Amino acid sequence: MGVLDIAKGMGVTLGKLFQKPVTVSYPEERVTLQPRFRGRHVLTRHPDTGLEKCIGCSLCAAVCPAYAIYVEAAENDPLNPTSPGERYAKVYEINMLRCIFCGLCEEACPTGAVVLGNEFEMADYRSRDFVYGKEDMLVGVEGSLPQRREAQRTGKPVRLGFKVPKGPRPELEGVEYPR
């Protein structure tokens, strides 16, 4: 019985040897994300006015099960408005180490300001760098927002096109890390 079992095992191994591999050579090869993929948070603007869509209602913070979102609202200046409403988000922070990417904040947002984009490469050296502020999440009107909503409507997967930085990072020169 022992030789027959070894032959069966070797047959499985040899059969898998000539199949296409499941993994990819990341980061040289990029994967195609599914239409409903939820990545890094993005705050959007109105395409016609360029004003922020976030009105500082804090519904996203209230619905977050991980308590990862902090919103501080302020009154909007009528002469120089930041958002179209009476209020705007003076402070909008999200702790990406606490976020579980559930998408409840995106569903709760009444203006569609919070969108979970396609970016998933969020590596850094310090945990404090994972707390993203409003400036880190706002995207411009020119359409730099990942086309996640369009992919959800059409059902076609989104192809990633991020550039991978190569070479030395001058901002990290001279930094010593504990061993």
From Swiss-Prot:
Residues 45-74, 90-119 form the 4Fe-4S ferredoxin-type domain. It is a peripheral membrane protein. One of its GO terms (molecular function) is NADH:ubiquinone reductase (non-electrogenic) activity. Residues 146-179 are annotated as: Disordered. Signal peptide: none annotated. Residues 168-179 have a biased composition (Basic and acidic residues). One of its GO terms (biological process) is aerobic respiration. Its EC number is 7.1.1.-. Binds 2 [4Fe-4S] clusters per subunit. Its cofactor is [4Fe-4S] cluster. [4Fe-4S] cluster 2 binds at C64, C99, C102, C105. It holds the Pfam family Fer4_7. NDH-1 is composed of 15 different subunits. Subunits NuoA, H, J, K, L, M, N constitute the membrane sector of the complex. NCBIfam families: NuoI (TIGR01971), PRK05888.1-3 (NF004537). NDH-1 shuttles electrons from NADH, via FMN and iron-sulfur (Fe-S) centers, to quinones in the respiratory chain. The immediate electron acceptor for the enzyme in this species is believed to be ubiquinone. Couples the redox reaction to proton translocation (for every two electrons transferred, four hydrogen ions are translocated across the cytoplasmic membrane), and thus conserves the redox energy in a proton gradient. HAMAP family: NDH1_NuoI. Belongs to the complex I 23 kDa subunit family. This is NADH-quinone oxidoreductase subunit I. It comes from Deinococcus geothermalis (strain DSM 11300 / CIP 105573 / AG-3a). The lineage of its organism: Bacteria, Thermotogati, Deinococcota, Deinococci, Deinococcales.
